[in-house]
Amino acid sequence: MRCLIVHNPRSGFGSDAVFAFERELVHAGDECVLRVLGEDCDNEQILADAESFDVVVVSGGDGTVSNLLYTLRNRNVDTCVFPSGTANLLFANIGNSPEPAALARACRWANTVSCDLGEASWELDGRRHTRGFSIMAGTGFDAELMAAAA
């Protein structure tokens, strides 16, 4: 299996569990490509060749995961959510094991679920803006809190 892992090291508490997950795949004979997200990364560029992999693993907190999944929308790409954030709400709702070896097995066996994404659009200063989300979207004070936490 060819696996692309896109990881945000700034998510959560900086856990290195994603590397244990990667080792499990490599020891089983799979090929893994790891791309680490920096501050000014372009998700479209990071995921430009996503279709050339058997699975794309998105590793980070809920914000990172939502942004990467939204970037992959409307593309025929199998994805795996790896919980590297603080709350990992989407991951918790999917129901996978958080243990790296178990998650690697599920990934290799192509155990999948379908998940809907939402999209919010608005106009500001004559420009249309669109954002995707996987769990929830907030406005006003909630949005200000989330922006401050990022």
Task: Map each language-model feature to its residues.
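Short active-site-adjacent helix-start/loop capping segments
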Residues: 65-68, 88-90
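Short N-terminal helix-initiation segments at or just after the protein's N-terminus
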Residues: 61-64, 79
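Short, contiguous clusters of charged residues that form electrostatic/catalytic patches at enzyme active sites
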Residues: 41, 63-66, 113-118
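ATP/NTP phosphate-donor binding region
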Residues: 1-59, 66, 70-74, 101-105
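Catalytic core of DAGKc-family lipid kinases
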Residues: 6, 10, 15, 19, ...
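Glycine-rich Rossmann-fold phosphate-binding loop(s) that bind the pyrophosphate
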Residues: 60-61, 84
